[in-house]
């Protein structure tokens, strides 16, 4: 049995009882990485020397009253979150040797909570992708079956947790990039409300959509991690000044009287039978605990995919214009003049998917098309947000599948961008509306790959999401299932 089969609270008891040390936890992580990483490929950079030194430092503090909330816990960090002195690449050749000179706010908070960073995790390049096949270095594999993708863009973050390489990890979610890989890898992933967690130090993909969040084995551990990283940050103008409650205190298991909305669009065309049946089975579990559910409509969700790709690509084309070979990152050697520098650096440094989205975004923002595409997409985004607000006027949470199907095979969709993009049809509306949502394991497909249940909440009501997710988790045994890697 791995130490990482235990929860944060259980590991803290073991530490305080001197049954284990922080060094034991760190060594457990690196031993597991040594055993499986050649197959999973979840990490891009390891930080062994610093992690072991930090473990020794914390071992001397075991039992102290001022220890952090996550004292001694090993964590992996997605490689688009900057870490002072630890390479941050965004899984792109453009930033292959980028060494940040500051920590992201979430990294500062993790350090204050006494976590230990094991390393930086693989991802789709600049967070653009749904399978982790767009990494500029190598593709991460799904620990449940190495022939399948782990999802994306936080594929390394989900795979590392599912493989038992770390206790938990941080990912980022722009259109489903925490929840979708969490579903594919059979773990728990939360996209917080936009503004709940600081984005300072997150390399931007689409600034109005990006949000950092936790990936864990259990709902309780997820609440621990969100507790540690949430809160107002004056370094981030989009950070919200909204009180952070006690997420752990709300894990009561009580859902009696809960009003659940189930959008008909989330169980209709394009959603596989396995995903549909797993959600209906989950609703029966919650009904048995005293919750009620009704079918509702989110009528503008059918426009979400087009809206998202217009807006996110437009923002990406602006955000990624800073990578020009002048200030930092890769610089092309094939340069005769300034135009060569820009053109060749970006052509050589960016992968195909990133180039595709930059071109799409540049087109949407160009003169003559701005009103027809970008401005219209913003208007539709408002309609989508209004749909959620209308439903939440009468219901506590919205529930549906996280993904239309279980994970697909490596290489199956990489040459068909539209089919790949459609994997996010159930997660994208949440980002457009800015509301929080969690994915928890809820079953398996015929291919024995995990399925996820998506629970969506009102703005800044992560507490209710956690309460429902925890109640479902404790009433089922899906969270106890492990990849047999």
From Swiss-Prot:
Coiled-coil ranges (or none): none
Catalyses which reaction(s): L-glutamyl-tRNA(Gln) + L-glutamine + ATP + H2O = L-glutaminyl-tRNA(Gln) + L-glutamate + ADP + phosphate + H(+)
Known role: Allows the formation of correctly charged Gln-tRNA(Gln) through the transamidation of misacylated Glu-tRNA(Gln) in organisms which lack glutaminyl-tRNA synthetase. The reaction takes place in the presence of glutamine and ATP through an activated gamma-phospho-Glu-tRNA(Gln).
GO cellular component: glutamyl-tRNA(Gln) amidotransferase complex
Enzyme superclass (EC): ligase
Thylakoid as UniProt keyword: no
Pfam families the record matches: Amidase (PF01425)
NCBIfam families: gatA (TIGR00132)
Family affiliation: Belongs to the amidase family. GatA subfamily.
The entry's keywords: ATP-binding, Ligase, Nucleotide-binding, Protein biosynthesis
E.C. number: 6.3.5.7
Gene name of the encoded protein: gatA
Matches recorded under PANTHER family: GLUTAMYL-TRNA(GLN) AMIDOTRANSFERASE SUBUNIT A, TRANSAMIDASE
Protein name: Glutamyl-tRNA(Gln) amidotransferase subunit A
Molecular function (Gene Ontology), one example: ATP binding
